[in-house]
A protein has these predicted regions:
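Membrane-embedded catalytic scaffold of the fatty acid hydroxylase/desaturase
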Residues: 204-350, 408-438
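Cytosolic juxtamembrane amphipathic/interface segments immediately preceding
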Residues: 156-167, 308-316
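Long, hydrophobic alpha-helical transmembrane bundles and adjoining juxtamembrane helices/loops
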Residues: 9, 21, 141-145, 149-151, ...
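Divalent metal-coordination and catalytic microenvironments
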Residues: 84, 157, 219, 268-271, ...
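Polar-ligand-bearing catalytic/cofactor-coordination segments
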Residues: 42, 52, 139-141, 150, ...
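Alpha-helical bilayer-embedded segments of polytopic membrane proteins, i.e.
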Residues: 3, 7-25, 167-214, 253-257, ...
């Protein structure tokens, strides 16, 4: 009798891990909600009452001069402008689902385009609770030509339905991912007691390609870009479209790719709102290892003080001149390890249960694959090749952003970034997501 838990059949173990990952995602979406169903109406009522209570204390200020509006840009006094209306979101900072930092970055500024890009139409109803007035006519600066052109382009694309994703495309991509993962696991499972260098290499490459492609699906799912419709009910499931997005996003990014979906969502949303802003975009702060813009030096010298700042400057002098040699090795080999570390730290610090479970399942099946290889040197080779294949994704994403200029918050007004889109993107790189600033 062979206990399934101790079974050495890698295919069986991986299948169990895959099913476990799916169940974990479903549990995080459904079971926890069902267990809280009795408290749901009460908590929603309390939250609505709390929101209205906090909003009712806001003083209506009527027409607000733009110069006066721009003074309210701190944690204790945060105002936003959206479509000419002024909102006091100070009491909303800690309850904002996207995190407080993204709001703080737009205190005292026009956040119209950012709000429209990140929120559904249903979310607009919360705005009126925090409105305190309107920008006085003739006091706000006129939007730049680039901003006007961007808004017109966005409206045209929406009307033409070009933001409506094709779910069939993602089903096809998911099948490709599962085929690559299954092929890689099957090759490793066929090794047996005698390890074969060729099989180890092929298995590592196939698994790496599958994880590489899963990252793209996870990216689009966590962006809620796989099914942009589906806010109603389907088979009794409310907001089914958004649940499909989250399910595929969490499953592909956490259970297959092995990173924290919550950490990625928070950082990546902030990245898209302040793309490549020196020393502020959380996904593109690489000092003291790499310098991506001379503007980073200015912010380091003028805004950073203390022992850590001095230590950073010391290592910058040593490492930055070597970045032409360290870029590829660090991006390919260290980048993925760094993602695993910060994902685990984020999930533990913020006690994200579904993140911890999904990352546990990732390590369960991935370590099982490694242990199926008999020889230690072949295990090391497998991990090295797998990281190299996935590392191509890191190199691609970093270079994709390094190729454009950085703009500070002050410079963003009236500027835009254009990218030469000539040529055909290979299948394995899919489509790059646009990077732009107003």
């Amino acid at each position: 009798d062979i206990d399934w838990w101790y079974c050495n059949d890698i295919l069986l173990s991986s299948s169990i891990g895959c099913v476990g990952g799916i169940l974990t995602c479903l549990l995080s979406e459904s079971l926890i909600l069902i267990s809280c169903k009795k408290k749901k109406k009460k908590s929603e009522t309390q939250q609505a009452a709390s929101t209205k209570k906090g909003a009712s204390k806001l003083l209506w200020r009527g027409d607000i001069d733009w110069c006066e509006f721009t003074k309210h840009r701190s944690k204790a006094d945060c105002w936003l402008c959206i479509a000419g209306n002024v909102y006091d979101v100070t009491k909303w900072l800690d309850r904002h689902p996207g995190g407080r930092q993204i709001l703080l970055n737009y205190c005292g500024r026009d956040a119209t385009d950012q709000f429209l890009a990140f929120h559904r139409q249903e979310d607009h109803r919360y705005l009126k609770l925090y409105q305190i007035g309107r920008v006085a006519p003739g006091t706000a600066p006129e939007p730049s030509k680039q901003t006007v052109a961007y808004r017109k382009l966005r409206g045209d694309l929406q009307r033409e339905g070009l933001f409506d994703a094709d779910l069939k495309f993602y089903i096809k991509e998911l099948l490709i991912v599962l085929a690559l993962l299954g092929g890689g696991i099957g090759v490793i499972a066929s090794i047996g007691a005698v390890s074969h260098f060729t099989k180890v290499t092929i298995g590592a490459v196939l698994l790496g390609l599958g994880m590489h492609q899963a990252a793209f699906i996870g990216h689009d799912g966590l962006h809620r870009g796989i099914t942009v419709k589906g806010a109603g009910k389907l088979f009794g499931i409310r907001d089914w479209g958004w649940k499909i997005n989250k399910f595929l996003g969490v499953f592909c990014s956490s259970c297959i790719f092995g990173i924290s979906s919550s950490m990625w969502t928070e950082e990546h949303s902030l990245h898209h709102s302040i793309t490549r802003r020196p020393r502020e975009d959380p996904q593109f702060i690489y000092l003291p290892i790499w310098l991506i813009s001379l503007k980073e030096l200015h912010k380091s010298v003028t805004e950073r003080v203390g022992a850590l700042a001095r230590l950073e400057k010391y290592f910058m002098k040593i490492l930055v001149p070597l970045q032409i040699y360290t870029f590829v090795p660090v991006a390919v080999l260290i980048g993925r390890t760094n993602l695993h570390i910060i994902s685990a730290c984020y999930a533990i610090k913020n006690f994200k249960v579904h993140d911890l479970l999904c990352q546990f399942l990732y390590w369960l099946w991935f370590v099982k694959v490694i242990l199926a290889i008999p020889l230690l040197r072949h295990r090391v080779w497998f991990v090295f090749i797998n990281h190299c294949v996935i590392g191509v994704l890191h190199v691609q994403l970093v270079l994709n952003h390094f190729a454009v200029e950085c703009f500070t918050a002050e410079e963003e007004e009236g500027k835009t970034i254009t990218r030469d889109g000539r040529g055909v993107m290979p299948w394995d790189h899919q489509q790059p997501h646009p990077t732009s600033t107003d």
